Amino acid sequence: PEEQMTLKIGYEPIKGDPEDDDDSIGMDDVSYHIENLEEKELPIDPINAYNHMAIYLRWCMEHDLMGGKFLAEHGEVVNQVKADPGNTDLRTFIREELFGCLFSALFNQKGRAFAHYYYGEIDAPYYPADIDDYALKYFGPSRYHSNEFQQEAYLFIPFDEKYYQTMAQVIEERFENWQGQDFDEDTLEPSEVAQAIMEYLDCECTYFPSMADDDPIM
């Protein structure tokens, strides 16, 4: 179920150069998934909680969506992923180098915008929901909904190349659809007027850049 796969916070404007600013938006935190795993005493290795995060990060590395600061610090990891992904376990990298979190500052401007569209709001399309859909197809409805998984079936998906390639195709389709929205790059971040309006409304707001097709918000 959707609520079992999510740890999201509302979008907040990032001021200044997205790659130089220390402010960042949280996307996912493994502690949430590990907490569920431990509370339900699931018989799996806690490293499985990083699986879906590692898939997303690898795809972004392979598609040049990482930010300048990240490349300066971890460029060798990106090169390893591109050269020999099968022998580069990004789960341990996320655990040891990223403290179990994915956050917007890891990515360049396009990567941030796509993450906000696909990983930052509980609306379709939504990356955690796509992971959950894969679990449903992989295990089948009967087993997926059984007490065996206790609503955490995604944690039991084998972390192998088939899993990555299947999800990579899904992410690719989402990315192509997103690019097809024809965003005005000058509006990827809220303008001063947009920020003022959101502050005036004094409620949780979702900012959308100027786009040719309003399908994502319909």
Task: Name each model-derived stretch.
Residues 206:
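Metal- and O2-centered redox machinery and metal/ROS homeostasis
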Residues 11, 26-28, 32-34, 42, ...:
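Polar/charged low-complexity regulatory segments
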Residues 82, 132-135, 168, 172-179, ...:
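Residue-level detector of alpha-helical secondary structure
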Residues 2-4:
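Compositionally biased, low-complexity intrinsically disordered regions
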Residues 216-218:
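Non-Sec secretion/translocation targeting segments of pathogen effectors
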Residues 6-94, 98, 102-107:
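N-terminal low-complexity, intrinsically disordered segments
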Residues 209:
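Extended, Lys/Arg-enriched charged tracts that mediate electrostatic binding to polyanionic substrates
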Residues 86-166, 170-173:
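Amphipathic protein-protein interaction modules
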